């Protein structure tokens, strides 16, 4: 399957922005603590923790920092009292948006999320309003690689799909619980991924034009600026021509 790696570009853009803000490690540590608290400190027996570990390593977090966060979760650190909250809504141009949060104060979090939507021409929806448009998947990404080699190793390891893009990037899609196992198998075959993360993949896309794309980007930026927001997923499709103007 060929195409342009817009989803990969979105992930890379987000990672760069989060790193610039100095927030990405804070958010990853919060997820590590919570995952360890809820499912135990063994990544092999805790898919959510394994996904958080993979994300931490993809963002160059040291093993020492990572292990301390897991220990905090297992030991009942205060951060482990966070709960996962999912908000759904519609953004500019009819984009479907899902926001994954970790919070110890629902009222604070929903107020911040609602404010971002109202400032950017969107609407916070009810539970289930857009969730049906997304599927939770593991995404293992290679910026470059041999398509046949990666595809053979990935499918043999249990991957669901392998997508090659026009720019040479390759994404391997897995059941989210199997992402760690598939990544291990790829590494055992000498194929080191550039990133691995659990994501919500949309089944449909909403085309953004020169008017709606900047509004969508502003909404995403505002949501990602919220301390309680861990991830923002959307189905906005931005062409190369429009992206060049942003």
From Swiss-Prot:
Highest taxon of source: Bacteria
HAMAP family in the record: Transcrip_reg_TACO1 (MF_00693)
InterPro entries tied to this protein: Integrase-like_N (IPR017856), TACO1_YebC-like_2nd/3rd_dom (IPR048300), TACO1_YebC_N (IPR049083), Transcrip_reg_TACO1-like (IPR002876), Transcrip_reg_TACO1-like_dom3 (IPR026564), YebC-like (IPR029072)
Region Disordered, residue ranges: 1-20
Major location (coarse): cytoplasm
Stored Pfam families: TACO1_YebC_N, Transcrip_reg
NCBIfam families: PRK00110.1, PRK12378.1, YebC/PmpR family DNA-binding transcriptional regulator
Example of a GO cellular component annotation carried by this entry: cytosol
Protein name: Probable transcriptional regulatory protein YebC
GO molecular function, one term: DNA binding
Family, as annotated: Belongs to the TACO1 family.
Compartment list: Cytoplasm
Xref: PANTHER family: TRANSCRIPTIONAL REGULATORY PROTEIN YEBC-RELATED (PTHR12532:SF6), TRANSLATIONAL ACTIVATOR OF CYTOCHROME C OXIDASE 1 (PTHR12532)
Keywords of this entry: Cytoplasm, DNA-binding, Transcription, Transcription regulation
Any GO BP: response to ionizing radiation
């Amino acid at each position: 399957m060929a195409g342009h790696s817009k989803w990969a570009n979105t992930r890379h853009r987000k990672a760069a922005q989060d790193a610039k803000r100095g927030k990405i490690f804070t958010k990853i540590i919060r997820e590590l603590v919570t995952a360890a608290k809820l499912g135990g400190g063994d990544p092999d027996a805790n898919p959510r923790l394994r996904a958080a570990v993979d994300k931490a390593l993809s963002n160059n977090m040291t093993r020492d920092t990572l292990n301390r966060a897991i220990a905090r979760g297992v030991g009942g650190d205060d951060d482990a009292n966070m709960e996962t909250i999912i908000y759904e809504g519609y953004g500019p141009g009819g984009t479907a948006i899902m926001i994954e949060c970790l919070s110890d104060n629902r009222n604070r979090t929903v107020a911040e999320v609602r404010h971002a939507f109202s400032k950017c021409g969107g609407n916070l929806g009810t539970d289930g309003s857009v969730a049906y448009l997304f599927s939770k998947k593991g995404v293992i990404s290679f910026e470059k690689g041999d398509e046949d080699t990666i595809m053979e190793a990935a499918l043999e390891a249990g991957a669901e799909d392998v997508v090659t893009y026009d720019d040479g990037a390759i994404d391997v899609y897995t059941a989210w619980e199997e992402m760690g196992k598939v990544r291990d198998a790829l590494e055992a075959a000498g194929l080191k991924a550039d990133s691995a993360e659990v994501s919500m993949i949309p089944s449909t896309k909403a085309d953004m034009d020169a008017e709606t794309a900047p509004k969508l980007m502003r909404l995403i930026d505002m949501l990602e600026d919220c301390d309680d927001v861990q991830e923002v997923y959307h189905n906005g499709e931005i062409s190369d021509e429009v992206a060049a103007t942003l």
